[in-house]
A protein has these predicted regions:
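Segments of small-molecule ligand-sensing domains
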Residues: 304-315, 326-384
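Extracytoplasmic ligand/sensor domains, especially the bilobed periplasmic-binding protein
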Residues: 89, 103-206, 255-278
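Short, low-complexity disordered leader/linker segments with a strong preference
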Residues: 1-37, 68, 391-394
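Extracellular/periplasmic periplasmic-binding protein-like sensory domains
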Residues: 243-318, 378-384, 388-392
Length: 394
């Protein structure tokens, strides 16, 4: 009797252990034996949809591919979207809904920087693992919150890359034109500090409002300063106004953009003046253009799932970020918890996605995992070209 009881005791003990493991998993919000619910926040409507809806579409096609292959440790990924309308209050409300009502396990998102920055406290308080896919505000990841990582470039990394690019192109008289809202200041101040550290004095420092319809005065001052390179810290609309007026007034410096103007083809159309973007160069978070043959696979998947859409550089933001999230989920293992996923992000080193210009590396002390912006150019009427990559060491 004693011998026959031992196997039963062992079986009972094993069952209790398994039940305990299942209960632990079940206790995690958004997690079941066969699914992981991931929340995403960003603008689904209005002009900010470029940084919200389109990256989310990229995330979703990656999730579909993973799910078709069996999921992650047997769990399928589900994406729950919430519109933050590129607005601070709406972003906070979106986080609260995803965390408390939708009960998601983790977050991937963040489009408009001002909105995401406003939501940082809500994300940190919720202790939910979060990966940013587009927002660049330094304050989102610095100082590091334990649960927030970024697969996007940050404003200080882009700012340093802009200065390095100007120097690499031989510029001697560097100027700047910028917005001074929260988004603009997040880039402007790092630029000033970087220029100071390099011993560079701007020959002109101009401000242009986000809703400006004329930049004649700013262009005339930049031209009078004989600037040979102008660092642009503007949204696409005011940047287009500046470029149009520069062309009209015969001012043709090297114009250096950033990821807020990440689609040179769309920007050329927005400027609407033949030849005006001839000397415009801009930063991209990804190393390929949507037309590149290397993106054929993703083009087919995006355009099949979202009929009428064409593959966009903003879809690629989501694709690369989703691959980083999936790598972290794999590393966290089958006995998944939020704490394990959070810890897994910090172990990602030299990870190559299908779209990032350089390897993605995260650490406990630095949650800015992407530091290798690519440079794009587009000859008027011609294709977009990738000029190279600048890796920032900071």
């Amino acid at each position: 009797m004693l011998k026959s009881g031992l196997p039963r005791c062992a079986a009972l003990a094993a069952a209790l252990v398994m039940a305990g493991g299942l209960q632990a998993s079940a206790a995690e919000p958004g997690l079941s034996a066969d699914s992981i619910r991931i929340g995403s926040f960003g603008a689904l409507t209005g002009p900010g949809y470029l940084y919200g809806k389109l990256p989310m579409n990229g995330v979703e096609v990656v999730f579909d591919e993973i799910n078709a292959a069996g999921g992650i440790h047997g769990r399928k990924l589900q994406l729950v979207r919430e519109d933050d309308r590129c607005d601070a209050a709406s972003a906070i409300a979106a986080i609260q809904k995803l965390v408390h009502q939708d009960q998601v396990f983790a977050l991937i998102g963040g489009g408009c920087s001002n909105a995401t920055f406003a939501a940082r406290e809500a994300i940190e308080t919720a202790k939910i693992p979060t990966l940013i896919f587009a927002s660049v505000h330094d304050g989102i990841t610095q100082p590091p919150a334990p649960n927030i990582y970024s697969a996007a470039l940050t404003s200080s990394i882009e700012s340093e890359a802009q200065v390095l690019f100007a120097q690499q192109q031989g510029a001697k008289r560097i100027a700047m034109i910028s917005m001074r809202d929260a988004w603009g200041r997040a880039r402007y101040q790092p630029l000033i500090e970087i220029l100071k550290a390099k011993g560079i004095t701007l020959v002109a420092d101009e401000e242009l409002s986000p809703d400006a319809n004329d930049a004649t005065a700013q262009v005339l001052r930049l031209k009078a300063a004989n600037a040979d390179a102008v660092i642009i810290v503007l949204y696409p609309k005011p940047a287009a106004v500046y470029i149009r007026d520069a062309q009209k007034l015969g001012f043709k410096p090297l114009n250096i953009g950033q990821s807020g103007i990440a689609d040179p083809a769309a920007f050329e159309e927005q400027v609407g003046v033949p030849g005006a973007t001839q000397s415009f160069r801009t930063i991209s978070q990804v190393k390929y253009t949507p037309e590149d043959a290397a993106m054929d696979k993703w083009r087919k998947l995006v355009e099949a799932k979202f009929p009428g859409d064409r593959l966009s550089v903003y879809n690629l933001f989501g694709i690369g970020s989703a691959q980083v999230l999936i790598e972290a989920l794999k590393r966290a293992g089958p006995d998944l918890t939020r704490e394990k996923l959070q810890a897994a992000f910090a172990t990602i080193k030299e990870f190559k996605t299908d779209v990032h210009p350089g390897p993605v590396t995260c650490s406990q002390s630095d949650h800015r995992c992407h530091k290798s912006p690519a440079w794009l150019a587009k000859e008027p009427g011609g294709p977009i070209r990738v000029l190279g990559v600048t890796t920032v060491e900071n």
